[in-house]
Amino acid sequence: MSFGRRYILLFITFSIVSISAIAQRNTGMISGKVLSLDGEAIDYATVFLKGTSYSCSTNEKGLYHINAPEGNYTIIFSSVGFEKREMPVTLKSGERSKLNVKLKPSTQLAEVIFVGNQLSKVRNSAFNATAVNTQELVNTTKTLSEALAKAPGMKIRESGGVGSDMAVTMDGFSGKHVKVFIDGVPQEGAGSSFSLNNIPVNFADRIEVYRGVVPVGFGADAIGGVINIVTPRRQRRWFVDASYSYGSFNTHKSYVNFGQTLRNGFKYEINAFQNYSDNNYWVDSPVEDFATGAINRKKPEHVRRFNDTYHNEAVIAKLGFVNKPWADRLLFGFNYSRMYKEIQTGVRQEIVYGQKHRHGYSLMPSLEYGKRNLFTKGLDVSLNANYNRNNTTNVDTASVKYNWRGETDRLNSPGEQSYQLSKAINNNWSAAFTVNYRLGENHVFTINDVFNAFNRSNEDLLTTPPSRDEFSKVTSKNIAGVSYRYMPNTKLNFSVFGKQYHQYVSGPMATSAAQDVYELTSRSIDYFGYGAAGTWFMPLGFQFKASYEKAYRLPTIEEMFGDEDLEVGDMSLRPEASHNVNLNLSYNATFGSNIVYVEAGFIYRDTRDYIQRNILALSGGKSAATYVNYGKVDTKGVSISARYSFSKWLSLGGNFTQMNVRDNMPTAQGSTAPNLSYKERMPNLPYMFADSDVNFYWHGLGRKSNVLTVTYDNQYTHKFCYYTANIGSNNSDYVVPDQFAHNLTVSYGIKNGRYNLSFECRNFTNARLYDNFSLQKAGRAFYGKVRIYFGN
């Protein structure tokens, strides 16, 4: 190397060293350890100098260090599960400062308090309402529907395993009588790839349930009630929540949720999950003998399901701004979900399919806007809008039929149920606008309007080119409401409200006896409903509630148009009308480390044109579901809820519900002849059921920030008739028997819930379980789950 080159290299090296030395003289360093109050190191805690970009994270030993220019700063320490701490520091040029800190474990407590306050707010309202805290279940493999079953008056009915058809029963009202919302946005038309029984419980902060009488803010035509899934809204700088579970029947479930809120208010969040299961559990079922064509219903065989694979995937993305002068929340969202579902049985278990299946997807862009104190103090507005495109393809092209042994027999014509390769294209628009105005401390006025529009077109893919139905199926509805709430003091509050219902329907209606000639038919209807609710916080921890609503429910898309497969629609269905009454008395008290809560409720429903799902016999021994109006249905019921907790280590409670839902029409539908089922129970409705749970908590197992939780829970359903009890022969054969399911869950949370392991055994007595006649659910099953959470 030449002398010149050596000189240049030496000069560059000397310059770098000199500059570094000068920089070091102008900077200082602060280091130390971040500990819990118990003296344990807190890893991955965030440490930063306020108002600067100088930051770091602690290592596994809780150590940190930051280099920054000399000066006075405020240093901030934060970590999930702990209270944020701020301290003044001074960095001096060329000096090292040492600062050890201890953080209080109150961030997790604050989160619990936040959720608890929201739960209490719902429970203390004038409406017959309760809230389920899903945060207690995040380490389990439960779905939102399974969490919902913990609410009083609720019964979840599924036809099988993961991804099976599901119906919610609330106070004797089931299916479409109960409306589902997510953050106050109606979920009609969302599609089967995004339903309560395939959304993980981690997706929600809590589930609110309003029974019978529904606040104007939902804009719902729900005579049964409303379920509102509330997603987390606490502002977190960043977070990652991920889990994976594996269990019986080759069941895989995974979930990931991550997001960030920047200092300028920009926010993004991604939520994704998937479910997969072979659903190949054992059932006891009559089997058709292809040699004789006979089905021996007295001698069921122990057989395994073989055409019941299900999987779905979903991604929910949101981005926008929060806490800005012009918006508290302005978020743009996009949901994508898809599903594949093999269909093992029809509406009865003895009907078995071997190749029938369906698949589909759903796309949904959305807009969410909210602003408190808009233009003037006390004026709050919110707007939610979305568009959903949902495509479902039904495939039934097999040339053979199957029995439960997996044997095949050739069909005279293709199609196990009905020969089809068809696509249903659903388009759904929804918008909800709410204005609240608080006048002083005692008065609140609310105006709400919810609009929903739907159309469906069908393509027959068996033709070349594919052909579309001559007539599209179209509905639109608008529900507008206004309410006034008066709160004279902290002990009393009252609400009165009115709702205007409008619906337009257009679609094909059969005009021939053979159901092969159709004409385009349309209709438009308008109704007005009203109601009131009040509550009184009595002495000694008692609370009394009373509410009433003249409610209407408009026929849904599926009830009028079917599902193009196993459900048959009826455009002539009339809206349901009901007088709904709720009375509730609750008691809440704390005695030292003991907390007691008890609530008893009475409900009454006088319903006209009640829409009931029945089974329709088709040719060839096949069946489908259809919907009919009953003239009058009378419902009376009671529910009791109780919960007790002691200190930090024990919590137990449960719910009991008994409903008396009777056919109250003296004459047969459409005639003057006596109604043979008059005063009989409505068929195919569970009328007595209960659940309970016991939770033990062992805090400090392994280290003080760890907790072991052992949970036992059960569900009981009393037997009920599939048909009206006094009509027909051999009705004892059509009874869903008594059932008692027992489950056990053990979970271990490490470092204030950062790492979590859980193990579940469901139905550990291996009982035969049925939610619907003859459709047997899974026996004993085992599941394991791992979950991690990072953030602050």
Language model segments and positions:
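Short, acidic, small-residue-rich periplasmic hinge/interaction motif at the N-terminus
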Residues: L35-L37, T46-K50, S78-F82, K92, ...
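Short acidic/polar hinge/loop motifs at secondary-structure boundaries
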Residues: H65-N67, V185-G212
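N-terminal periplasmic accessory domains that precede
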Residues: S97-K102, L144-A147, S164-T169, F181, ...
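Extracytoplasmic beta-strand/coil segments of soluble accessory domains associated
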Residues: S145-P186
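Periplasmic-side early beta-strands and strand-to-turn transitions of outer-membrane beta-barrels
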Residues: R236, S245, L262-R348
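Face-selective signature of the C-terminal outer-membrane beta-barrel domain
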Residues: I316-M339, R358-Q515, E519-G531, T535-P539, ...
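Membrane-embedded beta-barrel scaffold of Gram-negative outer-membrane proteins
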Residues: F537, F544-E549, R553, E576-K636
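Gram-negative outer-membrane beta-barrel transporters
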Residues: Y597-D606, V628-C721
